[in-house]
């Protein structure tokens, strides 16, 4: 089994956005678990997500209401995609949800990005 670890340092050449786009374009399915989704961030991925929808590449996204950072406008936009299964975890004061994981299913392997770009 080939092991290929990589540190994403958010330079001009290698940053989280570019890695997400690259892996989305290469995958057969994708799974995101992210604490927050805002519309401005989602806009950066819209063209790629539309391309995936046209190719019938399925994805699942789970996010949360944790700290009220997720924007309803972003969720509404994601719901327009027929290939994306969107789930929203309703957080409360006792139970938070602050994950940042991106999983890309390929024919022979999975690629996983864990962490934040901030």
What are these regions (language model features)?
Residues 1-118:
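PLD/PLD-like phosphodiesterase catalytic module centered on the HKD motif
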């Amino acid at each position: 089994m080939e092991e290929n670890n990589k540190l994403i340092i958010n330079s001009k050449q290698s940053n989280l956005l570019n890695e997400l786009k690259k892996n989305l374009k290469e995958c057969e399915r994708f799974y995101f678990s992210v604490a927050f989704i805002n519309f401005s961030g989602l806009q950066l991925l819209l063209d790629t997500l539309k391309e995936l929808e046209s190719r019938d590449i399925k994805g699942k996204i789970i996010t949360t209401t944790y700290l009220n950072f997720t924007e309803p406008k972003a969720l509404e936009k994601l719901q327009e995609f027929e290939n994306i299964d969107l789930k929203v975890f309703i957080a409360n004061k006792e139970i938070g949800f602050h994950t940042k994981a991106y999983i890309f299913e390929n024919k022979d392997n999975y690629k996983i990005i864990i962490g934040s770009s901030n």
